[in-house]
């Protein structure tokens, strides 16, 4: 069984985080391609990435301090 992932865009506005689910239950290549398209359309670049403690979420920081992307592994069950 292939792992599935969600793509989430987190935007900070006036110290409030707004989470937008962009894609759900997709293959990793599909999620990464969509994130790349969105970065290009917003003229952003990835400046660094980090992992959560369990390694199920990758956080991508962009050149805009108010926008990050998260790729989250979907857990079965």
Question: How does the language model describe each region?
Answer:
Residues 1-19:
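Short aromatic-glycine-(Arg/Gly/Cys) micro-motifs in beta-strand/loop hairpins
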